[in-house]
Curated annotation (Swiss-Prot):
The protein's role, per its UniProt record: Catalyzes the conversion of L-glutamine and 2-oxoglutarate into two molecules of L-glutamate.
Protein name per the record: Glutamate synthase [NADPH] large chain
Top-level taxon: Bacteria
Catalysed reactions, semicolon-separated: 2 L-glutamate + NADP(+) = L-glutamine + 2-oxoglutarate + NADPH + H(+)
Keyword flag Glycoprotein: no
Pfam families recorded: GATase_2 (PF00310), Glu_syn_central (PF04898), Glu_synthase (PF01645), GXGXG (PF01493)
Amino acid sequence: MNRGLHQPDEFRDNCGFGLIAHMEGQASHDLLKTAIESLTCMTHRGGIAADGKTGDGCGLLLKMPESFMREVAREALGVELGERFAVGSIFLPDDDAREAQGRETLEAELTKRGLNVLGWREVPVDPSVCGPMALDCLPRIRQLFVEPGEETGDTFDVDLFMARRHAEQALRDEEDFYVCSLSPEVVSYKGLVMPVDLPAFYHDLGDTRLETAICVFHQRFSTNTAPRWPLAQPFRLLAHNGEINTIQANRGWANSRKENFTSERLPDIAELDEIVNTTGSDSSSMDNMLEVLLTGGMDLHRAVRMMVPPAWQNVEIMDGDLRAFYEYNSMHAEPWDGPAGVVMTDGRQAVCMLDRNGLRPARWVITRNGYITLASEIGTYDYRPEDVVAKGRVGPGQILAVDTETGEVLHTEDIDSRLKSAYPYKRWLKQEASYLESALTELARFQNMDADTLAVQQKMFQISFEERDQILRPLAESGQEGVGSMGDDTPMAVLSTKQRLLTDYFRQKFAQVTNPAIDPLREAIVMSLESCIGAELNVFKATPEHAHRLILTTPVLSPRKFTALVTQEDPAFASQTLSLAYDPETTGLKDALQALCAEAEKAARGDKVLLVLSDANLEKGQLPIHAALAVGAVHHHLGRLALRPRVNLIVETGYARDAHQMAVLFGVGATAVYPWLAYQVMADMHRTGELVGNPADARENYRKGLQKGLFKILSKMGISTLASYRGSQLFEAVGLASEVMDMCFTGMASRIEGTGFAELQLQQELLAKDAWKPRKSISHGGLMKYVHGHEYHAYNPDVIKALQEAVQEGDYTKWKKFAALVNERDPATIRDLLRLKPAETPVPLEEVEPVENLLPRFDSAGMSLGALSPEAHEALAQAMNETGGRSNSGEGGEDPVRYGTIRSSKIKQIASGRFGVTPAYLANAEVLQIKVAQGAKPGEGGQLPGGKVNELIARLRYAVPGVTLISPPPHHDIYSIEDLAQLIFDLKQVNPDAQVSVKLVSEPGIGTIATGVAKAYADLITVSGYDGGTAASPLTSIKHAGSPWELGLPEVHQALRINGLRDKIRLQTDGGLKTGLDVIKAAILGAESFGFGTAPMVALGCKYLRICHLNNCATGVATQHQVLRDEHFRGTVDMVKHYFRFIAEEVRELMAMLGVRQLTDLIGRTDLLEAIEGVTPSQRRLDLSPLMTNDFVPAEAPQFCQVDRNVPHDPGAKNQEVLAAMKTAIEQKSGGEFEFAITNCDRSVGALASGTIAKRYGEAGLEDAPVTARFRGVAGQSFGVWNARGLHLYLEGDANDYVGKGMNGGRVVIVPPRESRFESHKTAIIGNTCLYGATGGKLFASGTAGERFGVRNSGAQAVIEGAGDHCCEYMTGGLVAVLGETGVNFGAGMTGGFAYVLDEDRTFVDKYNHELVEIHRVNTEAMEAHRRHLREVIEEFVAETGSQRGRDILEDFSDFIRHFWLVKPKAASLASLLDQSRRQPE
């Protein structure tokens, strides 16, 4: 067993991808050259290893070049290939004996199936173009030629598939044996080289005889730097850009469905150990699954639409027959959910498809020579504008295919209409499927439990008064989860000295960097909790029986629905109840679980379909098996036996009351849950008067609240459907022993051992002892707020009082008292179980580096002006500046009057809401921090209630006073690692002097993400613990999301050292740090910088009342309420300065004791720590060695950062050229016009000039002496990003994603090339997420935009000719006019600004999001002013772009005006709209 938190084989990957095909199937060498050119133009989307030369992998998958293969077979083997043949492209070990074994095994399997092996060809390669790391692991690359035998007939591809799979199985321990492709239709060329070197490496690719008609290409960006040759893409059918979030569930389900994958073509597939691989990349598993479906005889289009369906459950405008097709498919396979741009070919068709959220870009062009090219970016190869026949993009849930045999280009509608009419799906569903209805019998009526029995159950299942009041009451009253503030300062379950629920061990995972979270409120259209009841059937057959299922709209059952479900008379839904009660006198917990699994297996083999796992009706002397243990154990046991798809697991439990507890059950495999105890407790609360109203309504509200909570937990991980989440185990178990994990939660992370079956049983026995004592009342709780004598809180009244006394008086002896309270407490965090080893001879204190050297290592954590009062925010900034540390502005912008003064924050934060992020804000920072996640609520957005948005905050955030401000869960320009690299590049261009920091939250796998961040050229990484604070967050997030920094920090430190990147990047940690001892331990675990959030607030007077979210903070620290601030804020700059000086003093004393003079000598020195025995049985079973040792880390690897900045590979040459040309015009304010050529490799163009202007002239920019730049060509990503006032950019050509992102002024104008022949309003001209977070300026584009145009726009004016989904999302200001079609979900979360939308086909009413906006016609008399305004807007647009579409509208204005809608927030008055738009000029 290898020790350590980071394993080198862990990775995530994202990339650039594409395909090119000749529509008539004409093969040519030119097509191949064009593909390689396109691939090379996306080099910036890939990654480069630490050696600067090894790529993360790129490759090509070609339609079989028949004539070339016949010639090389003749030359190399002296054989004439017959009519049908296959070529294998194979990596073999670089060792004679191992190579021979690989060859012989594969040949034997092929021969066994009656195929003729003709021989092997050595593929000519040039290793000199490889980097050192690629050379190190370079395999022997061979091609194998095979022909069908006499008997083979039409099963040639099946025989090749089965032979290869059997060979792989036989060679599973030989990791250097890999079959890239083995097919009669396609052949693969891939490897660990840079795209530009691919044709030099493979001589075949430079051979003009090699001609093909289809080529799929891919360029990889992996988060680790130990790339492997087999992981390069494309795989055998597809190349995938994105990340399958539900991969563990998809793999588990696929492998348990063996019997459902047998078909006439695949009769013996059940012989395989695995249907899809369970290790390796998610994309390769997806490729395996697709390959099984196609080999089994399924049509390519149906297979991919089944694996990655579009959103269909909530789309009102979807055709009924098409919905039936998706519903029917969903009954037998769950979606592979997550960001996915997929390109694939089977040798005849070339196909591209996007996931339901459309989170990867895909742009296509058809040219006159018959080529169709599709790629992550437009402009990846050089064509003349006049040769373009059509261009467009693939949107969310869309698919595009080219059939090279018939020459057809098939769009989404064409493919969907073929699929939906293949079988009478709608009729079958009508006849066979039914929604579960409530049972109306007397038996089904809810029966209240008597008070005495209920008291026993509440004690046994650990329900406290606090849970009744804080969790169940808000759910029952309003259908909302309880909200709290501050962080979680209680011990984790494994460290607690009290009995804690098993679900408290589980920490929710969340998406960060490599994939985005989703907004479950504003994007509900893609979310679904629908579940199917009934046994799954064979996927290759289509019959009415396949539709014979019961459908649950929600998986949390009401009493009546539960009764209806378990009393079905239909044998297809036969049920059996399995009791979870066991007698501890005769059996232990582990034996009880084994017996339960055996019982479940017997029921499944006996044709029972519903297995009801129940802990209701416990009797005295019995203990309940925890529902999560039971579900996990049964799910895995039946999965291993391939029985799981035959049954549904229904859980009747007292252990699931809140959304987190439910999510744990679904995550480990439950189908539906009936929370019997929660319903009984709510009935009791009605009896006691804690709840008023109708009990049935309370139960209904409770279920609604749980559904919202479940959506939030799914969406944190970027998952849309419960069907995909079920069994995905997206948790980390902190502190559960391997025996528990192996039996019940196989494959879930648990890294430090801990509580085993014996300890779990012991805790239950203690609970049972009290439960049956009538005099023992139920517990008060104390998990949310401090209750004397209950759970320990790190910020208890004694600690707060001691800290405030020390800093108010500036008394170091009082500080010692505070430090002792924290440092000498019983273990409450993981670091409390680590003790320092004093040196034999301490160092004299005067030899230790002085306080002044240590203070610059301390930062205050990001807290926005909005969450904090202005007084508190400025006091923090001033104190940090005076001590030499750095304060962080948080995500609410900063008042420009503070720039350049002692009250300015050196760290400026860029969060998902982009509030107040202007060029001047960015230019006035020493560090730019990208806040990817927040410790208290990772994977979630934020919300500043309207009550806190006063005049000042509205001005700083470019919003309207009194209107709620929403920040989205993800950054809409970070859906993947290469997107983050782009944002870092944008920031380094606008402010080349600043360092860029990325804030992450601890979770398993954060090491791989951090190496990706380092490879994306960040300068700093902050690792936050789960216990960070927040101004407002759902209680389930505060308590259950994210992991401790003590696990995340050493994992990142180890990962960076293993990957040779630790010397390039600074590491910081934050979350619950209070004393000098915390700093010392963090340094030893790998940090060189330290962040403090809550403690400085407490130093300023915060009393930790946890009411920040209510805006009535009693100490004036976290409120905008003027009276509270004036009368109660007592904080001073000195209090904060005392706090940080005292920490530094304590750090020095401890360094002296350890015999260390410089803090840098401490970093990573885990030999100075030792683990101590804990005080509880669970604590004693913990194994903290993975934090301290990693067997993969090279001993000589640096322990800390050794460079000033991590310089990007791309110097941004175009920006240098633009700035050099304009320098004089900017410095002398002399104006001017300049011309430049541009390509898609020129990214963030304009940013360097804008940053220079903002630094020199502030927000005003060059308004009085504007400068114009004109470009021709195709612009790379982020054209016009952070555009300053007075800078005008004109582009003739196309642009990619993020045009005008964060612009603050000036103009960005984009028009099609003069020679183009297509209609602009039907053609994409700019990419996704344009104008994100813009605060001013004007954008005109004569063409359509992609997804999320104008997301978080708070002041820019824009006119475009069409838009994708989610246009104007979260908009708070400005104007958007769309002169053409829009996608769905227009105006979701829009609280300011307004839009004009042309709706010629009258579908807009179904496309806008009705929650916050309303629409008005513009052609009425009352709207005369708006009509005039709209006309002026279009006239200006035509004057700037010459748009034909605009001209047509103006010429027939009286007719077109009838089709326009005005879209505005419900909260805004019509009269005020025009005043606002006129107030915000350029």
